[in-house]
């Protein structure tokens, strides 16, 4: 189980990313615009740097919904491999069965 503080930190990162998404997209558009002046582009870079670090979506980590485990996360289920296996063995995931050949 992940610490509660780590889970809370991830929730905070998701909220910050949503809050600053439009502002970040606007600044990135200015930075990548070749027709914008160098001064405008540089000012956009400086403004982007003043935004909170955790507002960047790349700072988010996928975690298991049940345990908060950050490694071996399966996106399709939103769970770690361990919890997917446990749920599959109990028959809780429709259409998923143990491989046999």
From Swiss-Prot:
GO terms for molecular function: rRNA binding; structural constituent of ribosome. SUPFAM superfamilies: Glucocorticoid receptor-like (DNA-binding domain). One of its GO terms (cellular component) is small ribosomal subunit. Keywords: Ribonucleoprotein, Ribosomal protein, RNA-binding, rRNA-binding. InterPro entries: Ribosomal_uS14, Ribosomal_uS14_bac/plastid, Ribosomal_uS14_CS. Gene3D superfamilies: 1.10.287.1480. The keyword Cytoplasm does not apply. It comes from the Bacteria. GO terms for biological process: translation. The keyword Metal-binding does not apply. Binds 16S rRNA, required for the assembly of 30S particles and may also be responsible for determining the conformation of the 16S rRNA at the A site. Belongs to the universal ribosomal protein uS14 family. Part of the 30S ribosomal subunit. Contacts proteins S3 and S10. This is Small ribosomal subunit protein uS14. It comes from Cronobacter sakazakii (strain ATCC BAA-894) (Enterobacter sakazakii). The gene is rpsN.
